[in-house]
Every structure is written in structure tokens, then in C-alpha cells.
Amino acid sequence: MRVPLSWLREYVDLPATETGRDVQAKLVSAGLEVERVEQLGADLKGPLAVGQVLTIEELEGFKKPIRFCTVDVGQANGTGEPQEIVCGARNFSVGDKVVVVLPGAVLPGNFAIAARKTYGRTSHGMICSGDELGMGDDGSGGIIVLPPEYEVGTDAIELLELVDEVLDIAVTPDRGYCLSLRGIARETAIAYGLPLRDPALLDVPAPNAFGHPVKISEPLGCDRFTARTVTGLDPEARSPIWLQRRLQKAGMRSISLAVDITNYVMLELGQPLHAYDRSRIQGAIGVRRAEQGEKLTTLDGTQRTLDAEDLVITDDRGPIGLAGVMGGAHTEIDDTEGTTTEVVIEAAHFDPISVARTARRHKLASEASKRFERGVDPLAASAAAQRTVDLLVLLAGGSADAGVTEVITPSAPHTITIPANHPDRVAGVEYGRETVVRRLQEVGCDVYGQDELLVTVPSWRPDLTDPNDLAEEVIRLEGYENLPSTLPKPPAGRGLTERQRLHRRVGRALAGAGYVEAPNYPFIGEHVFDQFGLAADDPKRRVVKLVNPLSEEEPALRTTLLPGLLGALRRNDGRGSHDLALFETGLVFHPRAEQRIAVRLPVDRRPTDEEIASLTAALPEQPRHAAVVLAGAREQAGWWGKGRPADWADAVEAARTLAREAGTELLVRAGQYGPWHPGRCAELAVVLDGEEKVIGYAGELHPGVLKTLGLPARTSAMELNLDALEQASAGVVKGPRISTFPVATQDVALVVDKTVPHADVEAALREGAGELLESIRLFDVYESEQLGAGKKSLAYALRFRAADRTLTVEEASTARDAAVALAAERTGAALRS
């Protein structure tokens, strides 16, 4: 919100010596975010004067049209003689009033003006455009042509309000009332302890039955609608300079008189308005929900297909506007041919949620929707309509129609009961009842009571909903900087839980293995499941959809970590980082089988155990997952060696690393699941409650997925359920036994069917070898026709060691034979001869 200081002074009698910086400091202290103070015309120096063009001579022989003009500037040049000026603009004629800058002046950008010879003539000054004066481009494509009533020789700096200060305020979503001069003026008056001249205090005629008919079919979407009519408008009337300048300084451009007035009143009072050409409205104005598939062409010239949830303004022919967002082109005021002489003014209060969803659905943000989304004072509608009527009568020569239409759905004002000492308890400062009551009254509240206060919240503050909001108002107005700095006395901590410790160990272990953590937003689009090649009935396709998503492309909560990680990998690869190893641990979300509506917890008391349990039961399941993605080189090449590329074995090893940190035995076997390559995918499982449970997958991604997502070749990934891994843990990680006695190594080569997983053979060998087995390692896989059709050879190195003695050859061989025997029994393995 851009607030010109000169405009602000109309409502608050600030000291003449107060600068924009001073006001900024006061408002920041009151809790507003004033980002900067823009100095308009700070480097501007006169003389600048109103001039009248006396003669124009067209100069020929140049590459572009050039005019030699004589301009009457009165006594501004000290002589009263006409000023000779060379100008290239074409949008003025003899007799027009223009802005002339004379020699000795300095324009914005340190542009000094002096008499100089150009195009064969001497130019004593310059005829100015708005851009040259720091006013911005007015869209005319030329110099400023002033209305004829301005007197020649008048100081143009004061006339055009070229010197001013503008506060640029970032209004937070809960402070919608500050998207107006009225709201900022109220905060300024409170900050300075000065009275406020409220621009909304106007004499408004009572509603009657003679106004333009209005029918509201959706009272929940529109609880207040005021319609006023102005007739006899001069279609040639244009916005005066003061109105144009205020709009420009507030960040809006001048369009036409009627539109400028509605924008001006919106900036002044915070109430969005819309003006309809009365001759283009057929029948009564209505407010209803759109019919699915209805069409509407909005003021931006775009034809929009409406949704059944859209709130629309209608006449007898159909929709004529998106309520609270943008009007329709069919009923707009004609500012090109100048045929509009009668207008109907709409000042309404629309449901903030409906407006926000419509604006987002149609990707159509407007100044009106921005205000309705944040909350507009419903009681300001009639005053805003009256202010608009007054300005149209004053500036366009119109007449106010006697009819006043006002359709209202009554609602009781919001009241809050608060102990008088509640702000004291929140802030730890003794304010006292008198201070609390005074501060609440300053923000517009009506306050009754002694120790227990009954507070009626003002209509322009929908953000005040509970006692803590009122306490915040008292604290911020008394000054956050006045709160004492005291260290709290926290209770003794109980340390991290076992789950928290595991999460930290997992992160440290992956970082130690060379992975970089890359947290991502938990939002996904459902199209990613098609890209991953998941089956139509895959559980991951059941998502929790957001009612108010940040992006329409990602409207759901993630059921897998891989989309975010792979997106991060793709972005980094596209920016030149090709050797990547990323990881993330985070929650995924699965809807419960029984959908429940979450209860709304109270804010003025502690929720009951039943309320908390009901809320918890409505939440989706949120297991924590861990995932890694790899691409490029895993080990860099150099003088020390060739290096090696990352492959799917690294992804499997990452899963084993997590299992070791959890103290869990991880079962790894061949698997097949999207988005992994069917021949290079490992299924990860643990034993939970005596049964094997698949908790994730690791391997190389499918080539089709890589192509669809634009990922590097041979990209690998792993994802597993960290909570399930923790549940399978024995709790305490057992360290390995350490023996000082020699190790006995036995190698075995077993021939098995190609379909037998290595993990099954290893598990049988480990169990059969008994407690003397220290470790087992697969060191060779061999396939040949000599082994037989459909056969492969797996070679293992078995290390045996005893804790209390040196093993004999016979003991090691016996353990080896037992291991081979059990492998033969379970997997059909045979010793390779």
C-alpha cells in the first residue's frame, strides 16, 4: 500500500516538521511494515510554470518531426515575454495549456535545463511530459496537456504536487483495513495521540424503494449490497489533475473519470466499488453462484468459463461480473466514445473465502480481490457509495438519483470477554485497566465492565477474534520496545526421544556417506504418479488434497519423497552440478480409510482430551520416510584412479546404512516397482512382529522415467519407511564382538537357479554357520553354459572366529559344511566343483 504523506495529512494533523521517515518510525513501532519512504521530487528545482502555446512552426529537413513553439509563461521567466522552445511532441495544439520548465531548473535525474541551440534554433526551456517530471508514463505518448482553467504562469511544482513523500507499506493478511488511507490514518492518529478525521463519516440517505432493484440469492456470499444511481454525467469530463496525481502516487494509473473516482474511494475508504453503465444493464442486479460452464468476458477482454463455486453479479441476461474480483466487459463504462451518461454504483460486501477462491481459480488478482480476501469493513459500503456519488456530482456534473438500494443480511457484532489483566499476564507487564480500556477504544472497540471486560470489536477488524488478539493490540500500541528483556526459567529438559535420536543419527550417517540434505516442500501434483508409471490402484495415488493449495499444479500432500528430490537433482544438474548425491528425511501423508471432519479447537481455553483425540483422529497418517537420489560420479577420477559412476548398488548401500543406524537387519531381494528399472530394483524388507514387511525400494530408475523427468542417465534412488525401520529395531544397537584370536576364512562357490535371490542364499549360510561366523561377503557372481541352463554361481567368503580360542581347521570346515547344507536345503544350492 502506497500512502502519499500529503494525502495522509488530510485526516491527521501531523506536525508540519514531521517527515516521512518520522511517520515511518512511528508506524513501525506500532507494528506495521513500512518498507521504505520514497522521496518524490527531492532533486527537482524550478522554475516550472503553466504555459499557453501561442504559435507552432513545423521545422522541416530533419529525420523526425520537429516543432518550434512560442509559449506564454506569464511572469515566470521574469520578463513576461513569450518563451521560444523546440519540441518534438505532436499531441498539443495552439492554445493548449502545457507545463514548461525554464532555464536554470533541474529535473529528476539531475537533468539541468539551459538555453541551447538545437535543430537550427535556440530552445529556451522545455515542454514537459509526465515521465520527465517523475510522474511516470501517463499513457498519452506525449507532453502533459493541462485543463484550460489553469492560469498561465502558475507554479507547476505545486499544481502537480511534484514534491511529496510516499510510504510504501507491506500490509500483512490480517491487517486488511490498512489497505486504505482511512486505516493508515487511524494507525497514525493512534501512534501520535492525535484525533482522526474519519472520511467515512458522511451523511448517507436512508434506503428506499426507488433505487435500482437488487436481488441476492446467495446471502452467505454477499451479506450487504448498496446500489446508487447518478444521472446526467458529462461524458467529456476528465479527471482533474489532483485526482490523477493521487492515484499515480498511490500506484494506480488514471483511466476515466468514473473509474478513477471508484479507485480513489477504494484507496480512501478501503471499500472496492464498481460502476456500471446503466444503459447496458437489463433488469435487476443479482448476486448468485454461477452455473457450471457459464461464460463471462471480464474487463481485461478474456472470456472465462465459470465454475459452480464462483460468486457472480448478474442482470436478466446472465453474469455481468465476478463478485469482488472484476466486472464484465458488457456493462463497462464507455470511455472511448464517451456515451455513458448514467451509472449505477455498486458497493457490496462479499465473502472473503469465495472471492479468494474465485481469484485463484481464474488466476485473476485485482485490487478489489486483494482487499476482499483480507477483510473489508461491511459498514463502509453505504459511505463509500455516497462518497462516489458526491465526487461524480462534483466532477462530472451529474445528479444523484433519489433512489437508494441497500440489501442487508443482519449480523450481530462480534464480542469478546476478556479479563482486564489479561494483557498484563501475556506481556508480563502491569498495564492496568485504564490503559487496556484506552488502547482498545483507540482501535475502535466499545468496552464495558470492570474486572471482566466485554469488548465489541469494530467492523473493520475481523482479525480480532479472541482475548489474545486484544492483548496483542494493547501490547503493540504500548510499544514492543518497552517490554522488559527477561530470561525465562525453562523446566529441566528430558532430552531427545529415541525416535529423535534415530532421525539425527540417520541424517549424520547419510551426510557422512557423502550425501547432501535437500529438504523440499511437501506438495505434489497427481500427474507425477503417471510419470512414475504407478498402477492405477497403487496406494500412493491416494492423496490428501488441500482445500487452499499454494499452487494449482501441486494441490496434494506427498505420499513419496522422490518427486521433490528428483526435482532438486534435475535443477542442480541443469545448472552444471552433474555429480550429485542428495537425501531427505520427512513426512509423507496417507488419508485414513475413514474420513473425518476435523473439529475446530477453542482458543479461549485449553482443549479437552476428547477434542484433541477427535482432531488427531481426523489427521492423515504421517509416517517419516528417508530417501536418497544419485547421479554422475560417485568417486571422482584423478591421478589416484579412474573413479567410478554412481549406480544402484550405492542406493542399496544407503538403505543398509540406515538399517545399521537403527540396529535392524535389512532383507534385500530382487523387486519390481515403479519408478525403478525392473531388472535393477531391490525390495527392502524387515521382520516386524514375526512377519516380513516391505518398507521400501532401491535401485536404478526406469529409462522411461528418466526421459520423462529430464534426469541424467543411470540415476538411482532409494526410499524407505523410517518409522517401520525403527519399529523393527531391537532398541539398543549391539556392538560387534571383538576377539583377539586369529580369523579362519573359508570360501564357498554355490550353484543355484538364476531366480534365487542372493539374499536368500546369504541368510541360509549365515544361519547354518552358527555363532562362529563373524562375517559373510559375496565376492563373485558367475554365469556360464558349463553351469547348466538357468544357473549361476555365487561365491562367498566366510570369516570364522571364536572369542575364547583359536579355531582349528576342522571347526571352521564343520561350520562351513553346516552353512552349505542349510543353503542346499532351502535354496537348492550345490557346491560348485
Curated annotation (Swiss-Prot):
Residues covered by the tRNA-binding domain: 42-157
Sorted UniProt keywords: Aminoacyl-tRNA synthetase, ATP-binding, Cytoplasm, Ligase, Magnesium, Metal-binding, Nucleotide-binding, Protein biosynthesis, RNA-binding, tRNA-binding
Keyword Ligase set for record: yes
PROSITE patterns, A to Z: B5 (PS51483), FDX_ACB (PS51447), TRBD (PS50886)
GO biological process: phenylalanyl-tRNA aminoacylation
Recorded catalytic activity of this chain's protein: tRNA(Phe) + L-phenylalanine + ATP = L-phenylalanyl-tRNA(Phe) + AMP + diphosphate + H(+)
Binding, Mg(2+): D463, D469, E472, E473
CC cofactor note: Binds 2 magnesium ions per tetramer.
Subcellular location(s) of the protein: Cytoplasm
Ranges for domain FDX-ACB: 739-832
Gene Ontology MF term list: ATP binding; magnesium ion binding; phenylalanine-tRNA ligase activity; tRNA binding
GO CC terms of this entry: phenylalanine-tRNA ligase complex
Needed cofactors: Mg(2+)
Quaternary structure annotation from Swiss-Prot or TrEMBL: Tetramer of two alpha and two beta subunits.
Name this protein carries in UniProt: Phenylalanine--tRNA ligase beta subunit
Lineage: Bacteria, Bacillati, Actinomycetota, Actinomycetes, Kitasatosporales
Gene coding for it: pheT
